[in-house]
UniProtKB/Swiss-Prot annotation:
This is UPF0284 protein MTH_1426. Belongs to the UPF0284 family. Disulfide bonds: none annotated. It comes from Methanothermobacter thermautotrophicus (strain ATCC 29096 / DSM 1053 / JCM 10044 / NBRC 100330 / Delta H) (Methanobacterium thermoautotrophicum). GO terms for molecular function: nicotinate-nucleotide-dimethylbenzimidazole phosphoribosyltransferase activity.
């Protein structure tokens, strides 16, 4: 199903009626975990150590046109080729749509040099220990308060995230809640290290004394053992909102939905949708739709910026499987489309930013 050029819809498409031409607000939740330091598990940084800077640098780039916590702009490097951070996609789309951008600290080890809402200040641990997140229910409850407040200021809330190694922690939560997500979460690299992710998750579950599905009635235990702090923060924002919420992200957002379903088995997803990029939706190494359909009737909106037509070589790396999504890129592009901006104009603006701020 396609209603706008560059947009594919998986699901009923009914959600769009409530968010088209509405005042919107975009908030990005930033978080880090020690899991991202495991070699080979993520490409969201030039080295495992630098992944801790990626979320802060991403939102600083959107606000200030340049990172302040790092001398260089975050990028994913595979075989010598650098793919620009998805923050440039988010920045371009939000500028064109004239949508306000906010930041929430869900647990970032490096705090961004921008004004932000403090939901949680403690980063996540290494999920292999089985002790990943401190007080996840408290994080969720603070997210609820943020969702209630922000939804009183707008007609449509879009929530993105920047959490290196977030697909691994998503796999952990999905598995603990009983979902079949093995070999289905995406990755920021062309090679998806499924075996490593599963090994890391199983080590965490073992050390926490948890079997697959054990946490279906104890959802916060799943996050505490093998999750990340972004997941309960964003679940809280979404469940606290009184207006439609677009979860802007890839397979990490299915873990958010799974947590919401476990907290409230009767949760109605008709006012909640996932928006992502074509690079996630058509990734042969993952399956966001198969995960989502296990959880509920969740519309997924997929934006294709047609980077094959881009002249900037770094953007071609997205076509080769690098990056795919992040910082709410898919949701930001959806916002631009909903505000009547053609996808070609979004791509052109992305290229302009790549040629100026990434030069």
């Amino acid at each position: 199903m396609e209603m706008f050029d560059g947009l594919k819809i998986y699901g009923s498409g009914n959600y769009l009626e409530g968010v088209t031409d509405r005042d919107s607000l975009f908030i990005c939740a930033v978080a880090t975990t020690e899991t991202s330091r495991i070699p080979g598990i993520t490409g969201a940084g030039a080295s495992p150590e630098l992944t801790e800077y990626t979320p802060a640098a991403d939102v600083e780039l959107i606000v200030h046109d340049a990172p302040r916590c790092l001398p260089e702009i975050p990028q994913t490097i595979v075989e010598g080729e650098a793919a620009p951070t998805p923050a440039v996609i988010t920045k371009a789309a939000l500028e064109l749509a004239e949508v306000p951008f906010m930041v929430a600290d869900a647990g970032a080890s490096v705090k961004p040099d921008v004004p932000y809402i403090n939901i949680n200040s403690e980063p996540g641990g290494d999920i292999r220990t089985g002790r990943a997140v401190t007080e996840p229910q408290r994080i969720y409850e603070r997210g609820l308060m943020v969702g209630r407040t922000l939804s009183s200021l707008t007609e449509h809330l879009v929530v993105g995230e920047s959490t290196p190694a977030g697909t691994t922690t998503a796999l952990g939560v999905l598995t603990a809640l009983g979902y079949d997500a093995d070999f289905r979460v995406s990755a920021s690299m062309p090679h998806n290290p499924h075996d490593l992710k599963r090994e890391v998750v199983m080590a965490g579950l073992s050390n926490a004394g948890i079997e697959k599905g054990d946490c279906s009635r104890e959802p916060f235990r799943a996050v505490e053992a093998v999750g990340d702090p972004m997941i309960p923060a964003v679940a809280g924002i979404c469940m606290g909102s009184t207006v439609p919420v677009t979860l802007a992200g890839g397979t990490q957002m299915t873990a958010v939905c799974a947590l919401m379903r476990a907290i409230d088995p009767d949760f109605d997803f008709s006012d909640t949708a996932i928006a992502t990029t074509i690079f996630v939706a058509e990734d042969s190494t993952s399956d966001i739709n198969r995960i989502a359909e296990q959880i509920g009737d969740i519309d997924i909106y997929v934006v294709d910026p047609d980077f094959g037509s881009a002249s900037h070589r770094g953007l071609h790396e997205y076509l080769n499987g690098s990056v795919k999504e992040g910082v709410g890129a898919g949701g930001a592009m959806l916002l631009a489309l909903l505000h009547g901006i053609p996808v070609e104009m979004v791509r052109e603006r992305i290229e302009e930013l790549c040629n100026t701020i990434l030069a």
